[in-house]
Amino acid sequence: MGAPAERTGTWAEALLTFIQRYPGVHLREIRRRLGIPIGTLDYHLYRLGKRGLVSVRMQGGYKVCFPETLIGEGPPIPEPDKVLIALLRQSVPRSILLHLYLEGTASPQLLGAAVGASGPNLSYFLKRLEALGVVEREGAPGQRQVHLNDAKRIHEILLRYPPLPETPVDRFVRFWSELHP
């Protein structure tokens, strides 16, 4: 675990700024990144929610947080985008969409190898992305191909809502796994 972020204001201010910068972030990731004790985090999320500044909801087994107003960008995030953004905070769905965006249509086997996902894990996320209308699988079993339905929308969301910055531990794990595949 990395060191908690240095505080310059209150935990509520740090929390709101973090959620505005990284909408759809998971509760445990907030705790890990900001070093806020879980009880304090729950308290401040409740208070910010009561003030209409953030919303917290369960999605895919995770508590995810969204700002009700973005920093300097006006209206709240549209509901269909919230589901996709929260999914993109997870590495496998993000890798799937980035691969399809950059490389184009791919078979599930090629996609699984490219993103480092097992068959069941890949299938789980493809079903979720397909239910959102983001990807489509076509063809007979054994000859299936996966493609993006709206590459422009994915591009806009990926640019507008950047991934969380890599921590030193994340970099070490990535480096180590590249050296020892």
Please provide the spans of the model-predicted regions.
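Long, low-complexity, charge-rich intrinsically disordered regions
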Residues: M1-R21, R47, M58-Q59, V64-R89, ...
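Short capping segments at the starts of secondary-structure elements
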Residues: Q20-H26, E103-S107
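Histidine-centered active-site/metal-ligand motif
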Residues: H26, H44, F125
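A short acidic, leucine-rich amphipathic alpha-helix
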Residues: E29-R32, L110-A114
